[in-house]
Amino acid sequence: MNIKLDYSDVSFRKDGKLKLLIIVGTRPEIIRLAAVIKKCRKYFDCLLAHTGQNYDYNLNGIFFRDLGLEDPDVYMDAVGDDLGETVGNIINCSYKLMSACKPDAMLVLGDTNSCLSAIAAKRLHIPIFHMEAGNRCKDECLPEETNRRIVDIISDVNLAYSEHARKYLHECGLPKERVYVTGSPMAEVLHSNLPQIEASDVHERLGLEKGKYILLSAHREENIDTEKNFLSLFNAINAMAEKYDMPILYSCHPRSRNRLEKSGFVLDKRVIRNEPLGFHDYNCLQMNAFAVVSDSGTLPEESSFFTSVGHPFPAVCIRTSTERPEALDKACFVLAGIDEKSLLQAVDTAVQMNLDGDYGIPVPDYVEENVSTKVVKIIQSYTGVVDKMVWRKF
């Protein structure tokens, strides 16, 4: 793997504005940050760096196109042969990049390995702003839970989605004056793309009838890489195909595809494996599905948003824990687990309640449409404060 370590040609415009470095590496980060990236590019001297954590075009490139984003200014190509090498490369490449371009502040979102670039920023005394801070599912089997703790603790300003998340941050001993509840950035992204989502012709292209298919996404490490969980989940998926006797469109990520091929597991013929879909197509499929069965972290946010705009869908989360309890507070989705009995019961319940018009209530923090404005103003407000009070730069 040819890792890019020379960033001597990378520089900000030096136009007098605050110099902000945003680092991403995965599809969910790109989606959630889309509106924030655009706003930061407008008001800051902004560089966008991609670690290369998800290298597949269908997982990354297509979303830059769909969301109207410019390509990253820097591509690190930091993926190694194993987890240890990848994490080391991300920190090393980030350190080299920040040493070369000297940002005033850096912004990361979420709990991916790419967020561990914040470690480099901390050692270089660069103020760190962390969106999606404070999310906790209290499940140690999730690698993301470790990343959350690390990045929350070392960040200078944590931007939480909800009061639940703020509470978790306070329990960690973080100072309340460095924690803000901004709400989720997803509504801003979804609302600005709603016309394209509604206009998608994905059903015609895939030969699907609206309301007569189940949309499936299963890709999380704990569901795919753990043998017991993998077999439990995919046996349950086959049982779901047999019970409902309709197409199950499986948006199949590389991790899942490789695991299925290696295991030799035979999916029911009604389960249709498809390459990961674009942003507009996937959301159009969601809002017209008989049910959406997914282990994606954004499912509760998407369900809440589409309910708020009159496109509710039965949302079933194939996990045993959630870091978004505020969405359960408002009944935006059903937590199903990964065994056959629990999954089938959860789908039945979610579908029937949707038919009865019992949709739950949109989460107030998930329908905020000025999150990007909040983020820009908080970064502008606190970069100097961190420089003075934490690093004593002046």
Indicate residue ranges for each PLM-predicted region.
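Nucleotide-activated sugar donor-binding and catalytic core shared by glycosyltransferases
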Residues: 1-246, 256-394
